[in-house]
């Protein structure tokens, strides 16, 4: 179909007249819809930024005020002897939220409660793990978060499907490359399988950032921006904990399998 001065001429030769005012109205409607999507995105990720700033300030104040005897304490630092216990909280909270929202309407109070529930494992991590390890995991998570959400928010609307295909292709290639590197190492098969599974979960969580950003841009009304912000924040914290889980997996398996081949 080609356009000629207000006329739309299909390939079969039929001429359809479209007044210029309707064309301008369609263009204005699309522009306003895109502006509204940007407003929702700004409110949502602005709220995520405030949550990150508040949580960082809370954890920094706690680590500064905590007694020196708490750091790497044998009873408090479960991340060395049984690190998986720390990660039970985010996993169960994600499962509970999914089950709750499938049978009940979305409730911001429930999400805020489970957001605060992530603070104890983060405190344990800050007290028991090396600060360089925590900072590197946080930077990796934020880089993946900003990359996926940036593509989703800045790309034109007509490339939504192409965005999804590109992001999923990149995630698949990244996962394949990491698995190839893992399989070529001289570790035990148990360690290789568990590590590959953890990498898969993390890659899925990273790709979820892109889908969440698309949902915020195209589907979330402005009055539900806070609810969307809490969901995005939960996925961000969950991914951070999964990245730390992978980084501490070697110590975990050494403790339980007592193998020197890892």
From Swiss-Prot:
It is a multi-pass membrane protein. GO terms for cellular component: host cell membrane; membrane. It comes from the Viruses. The keyword GTP-binding does not apply. It is found in: Host membrane. Keywords: Host membrane, Membrane, Transmembrane, Transmembrane helix. The chain crosses the membrane at residues 46-66, 77-97, 108-128, 133-153, 163-183, 186-206, 226-246. Belongs to the HHV-5 US12 protein family. This is Membrane protein US15. It comes from Human cytomegalovirus (strain Merlin). The lineage of its organism: Viruses, Duplodnaviria, Heunggongvirae, Peploviricota, Herviviricetes.
